[in-house]
Amino acid sequence: MITELPDTTTKAIAAELAHARERHSLATGRVLTLLVAIDDSREDSIDETLATLRDASFEHPARVLVLISGDSEADTRLDAQVLVATDAGASEVVVMRLYGELTGHMGAVVTPLLLPDTPVVACWPQKAPKHPAGTQLGRIAQRRITNLRRGTNGVTLKQLTDGYEHGDSDMMWSRITPWRGIVASALDRHPGTRVHSAEIAGAAGDPSVDLAAGWLASSLGVDVTRCE
């Protein structure tokens, strides 16, 4: 079920969430609040993000607050959609489009909608900030997730590393998990063998290759060279 709330307030959104739980007898066992910041307002991009969140919700039911930054020069307005039941998987999703001064006050917008006594996770599936923990959403969240590989604003792995704080992670780490498992298994087969150096190769321009190289260097204590 999708409920449209044009030119609304966070109080009205919270009331609609409560009414939706009553109407649909929804379970309240949400394990976290997930904040998702999107700058791209294309509907196909939003639909792709919502589909991913819906699939993930069956393992991790959450309250998902999606924030889409609109025109900061427009009149201040908050438009929202509340998605529950089949349209939200096992979660409850609020899609909020921010205009005017609200684009610079994301933290204030989401605060009244946070679930009590549950962790808060912030995610930037498109444009990764250089210092996630320094953003308004990042200061609220205990965990911060970026997706540098799909970044569209030119932030590099080096910049993300320089701005790292405890609780930051990037989706690249999950992507290289199978590869790390294979490497660790191969090294375990020869426990007495000393590694003096390593070379790593991968797709040109893919930052996950540099992340894998850093993991090798840290784990083995040797110099690692990236081969193009």
Which residues make up each language-model segment?
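Short, solvent-exposed amphipathic alpha-helical segments in soluble enzyme
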Residues: 52-56, 110-112, 136-139, 213-221
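An N-terminal, globular interaction/scaffold subdomain
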Residues: 1-122
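Short, solvent-exposed polar/charged micro-motifs at secondary-structure junctions
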Residues: 75-78, 132-133, 156-157, 207-211
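A short acidic (Asp/Glu
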Residues: 46-49, 106-107, 132-134, 208-212
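A broad structural signal for short, well-ordered beta-strand segments within beta-sheet-rich domains
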Residues: 31, 90-91, 117, 140-142, ...
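Internal, hydrophobic cores of structured domains that mediate oligomerization or house catalytic pockets
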Residues: 92-184
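A generic structural motif
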Residues: 63-72, 123-125, 147-151, 223-228
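A contiguous, surface-oriented mixed alpha/beta subdomain in the mid-to-C-terminal portion of proteins
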Residues: 157-228
